[in-house]
């Protein structure tokens, strides 16, 4: 039976959605209709939200799951009148944390995502700009400033991984696509050799690579299974020969790939 889930917040909804998605992912056999509802920050909005929740309960014949990070007690009480199963994330964790720290929390809306006074903000922006400027081998003369350089065949997940690490952790990650010419030379490009300690390889199953490339250039040599299989085989051989740590990205999310890379390379996050 399909269930409905709401991620409700008086801020952006990022925290409610992130934690809620992580919890729901543990129930793979249950399909969910998921709805994010940010900025529920007034009684009128809360009452309208209750109507949405109750409508979903009537439609589904079972109460929706509600993940909320509402700070205002009055708004939480209005939401609690709905026909939903509420998981109040802040009250679940803040109260015991207040007891342990012997201190009261600020109960500030959107506190963790505030830009003002956040010393990490500029580092995040600089890291994202670095990832964009050094994407796809476009520039190589700034590799000495990189924390990491991801290498692999075209369309194996290098760019989104670099951008995720930049956004989440302030990591300056460049990426370089290994081409057929590199494979024929049976060695790393010279520009990568002098940065060997920063290299990390991404590989991918050929059939998955074929599907991804087909969306970009259908019915081309570039997206053919034979070409994809050849490139993956040669790049994996190069990784082994050059002793480059690597991971197969096929069955992992960007979050998982990033975490595994940082652990493997021992790179410290600039902020957490």
Curated annotation (Swiss-Prot):
Transmembrane segments: none annotated. InterPro entries: Kinase-pyrophosphorylase, PSRP. It comes from Pseudomonas putida (strain ATCC 700007 / DSM 6899 / JCM 31910 / BCRC 17059 / LMG 24140 / F1). This is Putative phosphoenolpyruvate synthase regulatory protein. Keywords: Kinase, Nucleotide-binding, Serine/threonine-protein kinase, Transferase. It comes from the Bacteria. Disulfide bonds: none annotated. Bifunctional serine/threonine kinase and phosphorylase involved in the regulation of the phosphoenolpyruvate synthase (PEPS) by catalyzing its phosphorylation/dephosphorylation. It catalyses: [pyruvate, water dikinase] + ADP = [pyruvate, water dikinase]-phosphate + AMP + H(+); [pyruvate, water dikinase]-phosphate + phosphate + H(+) = [pyruvate, water dikinase] + diphosphate. Signal peptide: none annotated. The keyword Repeat does not apply. GO terms for molecular function: ADP binding; ATP binding; phosphotransferase activity, phosphate group as acceptor; protein serine/threonine kinase activity. Pfam families: Kinase-PPPase. NCBIfam families: PRK05339.1. HAMAP family: PSRP. Its EC number is 2.7.11.33, 2.7.4.28. Belongs to the pyruvate, phosphate/water dikinase regulatory protein family. PSRP subfamily. ADP binds at residues 152-159.
């Amino acid at each position: 039976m399909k269930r409905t889930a709401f991620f409700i917040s008086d801020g952006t909804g990022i925290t409610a959605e992130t934690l809620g998605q992580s919890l729901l992912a543990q129930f793979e056999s249950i399909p969910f209709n998921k709805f994010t509802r940010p900025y529920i920050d007034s009684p009128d909005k809360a009452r309208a939200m209750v109507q949405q929740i109750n409508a979903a309960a009537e439609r589904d014949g079972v109460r929706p799951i509600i993940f909320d990070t509402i700070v205002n007690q009055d708004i939480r009480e209005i939401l609690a009148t709905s026909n939903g199963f509420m998981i109040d994330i802040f009250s679940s964790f803040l109260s015991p944390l207040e007891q342990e720290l012997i201190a009261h929390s600020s109960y500030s809306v959107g506190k963790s995502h505030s830009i003002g006074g956040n010393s990490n903000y500029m580092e995040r922006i600089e890291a994202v700009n670095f990832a964009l400027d050094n994407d796809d081998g476009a520039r190589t003369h700034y590799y000495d400033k990189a924390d990491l350089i991801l290498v692999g065949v075209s369309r194996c997940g290098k760019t989104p991984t670099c951008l995720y690490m930049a956004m989440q952790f302030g990591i300056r990650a460049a990426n370089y696509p290994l081409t057929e010419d590199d494979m024929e030379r049976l060695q790393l490009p010279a520009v990568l050799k002098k940065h060997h300690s920063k290299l990390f390889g991404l590989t991918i199953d050929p059939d998955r690579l074929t599907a991804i490339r087909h969306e970009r250039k259908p019915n081309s040599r570039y997206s053919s299974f034979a070409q994809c299989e050849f490139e993956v085989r040669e790049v994996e051989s190069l990784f082994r020969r050059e002793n480059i740590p690597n991971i197969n990205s096929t069955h992992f999310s960007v979050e998982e790939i990033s975490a595994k890379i940082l652990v493997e390379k021992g790179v410290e996050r600039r902020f957490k």
